Amino acid sequence: QLGIDPSTGAFAEGGVTEQTIQSFKNMNAILTEAGYTMNDVVKTTVFLADMNDFAAMNTVYASQFEGAFPARSAVAVKTLPKNGLVEIEVIAVKE
């Protein structure tokens, strides 16, 4: 999920922190719709347009999970769709 606000179609205003927050809001909505929660997430992949944004993204990321963190990969990419700063994908599994 990119940090795009579905009500406006625009990126969350600010920087990577705001886009990361919006990305998690989007993921929570999708997971909830499917009957999952963030506690069901077993793997994440974080794509960053600039690896210097890792610490800011990670602060938000850490606040989204309770207990053990899911497995994670974080990679720098040349560009993201619509010139986003961060994109996060998750895999969730019901136990």
Regions found by a protein language model. Give the residues of each.
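Short, polar/acidic, helix-capping and beta-turn segments at strand->helix junctions
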Residues: Q1-E95
